Regions:
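Generic structural "secondary-structure junction" signal
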Residues: 55, 76, 144-145, 153, ...
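C-terminal substrate-binding subdomain of Rossmann-fold SDR/epimerase-dehydratase oxidoreductases
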Residues: 215-375
Length: 375
């Protein structure tokens, strides 16, 4: 079955967003609805909350009726079949998956089963319904310890240091193999760096189920009084202040990158040339018929240290935050930030928000919702 064209107007297109109730997914759904797309969320709520869906509708105003929500796992073939049978899906933005690095080392079977086997169920059903347009939520973890800074899309992939990262590498390779076997596949791999921040309204944001694994939500929970002290893992790295440096990107900037990627897939921006992954090249650049595998880093292109983040958050919340220096964690690297030239040139996308704004928006979300989506 031939692939769907993405050449039409946004309001004539329906995007399936797996994991759309999650942190990045919810912000992406808001941006899609703002751009007048029809959106179907498929989410089993294992890492999220239905309240997020209600708030997406709230933020979408007059376009709220263009959103549908289906509570189901990507492993549920019958549910996936119903989604495609009952909705004229044009493209998929695939966020769904378990995502805790530490947990993945303790539960590798569950991670490979859910993230890889579940994705294969989704891809198979999509192909059977003639949908071969996929934006995949990948990660900078696929680069491992980088050989150069800033990291470009041409940097080689390294063996992941944990099962979560390995699922990202595997799915990138699987989608690339699909295109090698069938040139109708239209795939964009978005490699995120470190998404933080929240919607400016303070109505949606990051809501970890347990003690946060990532720096910013941990800092925010210390600021709101839920946790006692920030742990800084290592202050002897070869960086300006000795703490690890990462590329933090506002989640709204990241969400807008997905909208730009849809335009790119439809031939509406960029040259349509696929990049990275060896000999893979875009097969077509005609309007609405671009195919191939394209890879883009989404970051700001600048690095901020752990102490930079803590001090920026102190300014946002107006209080000093306690922190203690702890030993380095195994596998952590000193510096990691992106080269984003290709996203600018091919997608017409540039991150707009700085670290101060990320912290301000995160604090607004956390202070307005100290218990996340729990009332």
């Amino acid at each position: 079955m031939s692939n769907k064209s993405l050449a039409g107007e946004h309001n004539a297109q329906t995007i399936l967003v797996t994991g759309g109730a999650g942190f990045i997914g919810s912000h992406t759904c808001v941006e899609l609805l703002e751009q007048n797309y029809n959106v179907v969320i498929l989410d089993d709520l294992s890492n999220s909350c239905v309240t997020a869906v209600d708030r997406i509708r709230e933020l979408s105003g007059a376009n709220a009726d263009q959103l549908k929500f289906v509570e189901a796992s990507i492993l549920d073939r019958e549910a996936c079949e119903r989604v495609f049978s009952e909705n004229d899906i044009d493209a998929i933005i695939h966020f769904a998956g378990f995502k805790a690095v530490g947990e993945s080392t303790q539960k590798p079977l569950e991670y490979y089963w859910n993230n890889v086997a579940g994705s294969l169920v989704l891809f198979d059903v999509a192909r059977n319904h003639g949908v071969k347009n996929i934006i995949f939520s990948s990660s900078a973890t696929v680069y491992g310890e980088p050989e150069m800074i800033p990291i470009t899309e041409e940097c080689p992939l390294h063996e992941a240091t944990n099962p979560y990262g390995e699922t990202k590498v595997m799915l990138e390779r699987i989608l690339t193999d699909f295109y090698r076997a069938d040139s109708e596949w239209n795939v964009v791999l978005l490699r995120y760096f470190n998404p933080i921040g929240a919607h400016i309204s303070g109505r949606i944001g990051e809501d970890p189920k347990d003690i946060p694994n990532n720096l910013l939500p941990y800092v925010a929970q210390v600021a709101v009084g839920k946790l006692e002290c920030i742990q800084v893992f290592g202050n002897d790295y070869p960086t300006p202040d000795g703490t690890g440096v990462r590329d933090y990107i506002h989640v709204v900037d990241l969400a807008r990158g997905h909208v730009k990627a849809l335009d790119f897939m439809g031939g509406k921006v960029g040259t349509g040339k696929a990049i990275g992954l060896g000999s893979i090249e875009g097969a077509s650049t005609e309007y609405g018929t671009r195919t191939g595998v394209a890879i883009f880093n989404l970051g700001t292109g600048t690095g901020s240290s752990v102490l930079d983040v803590i001090h920026a958050f102190e300014k946002a919340c107006g209080k000093k935050l306690p922190y203690k220096i702890c030993p380095r964690r195994p596998g952590d690297i000193a510096t990691n930030y992106a080269a984003c030239d290709k996203a600018r040139e091919e997608l017409g996308w540039v991150a707009e928000y700085d670290l101060a704004r990320m912290c301000e928006d995160s604090w607004r979300w956390q202070s307005n919702n100290p218990n996340g989506y729990k009332e």
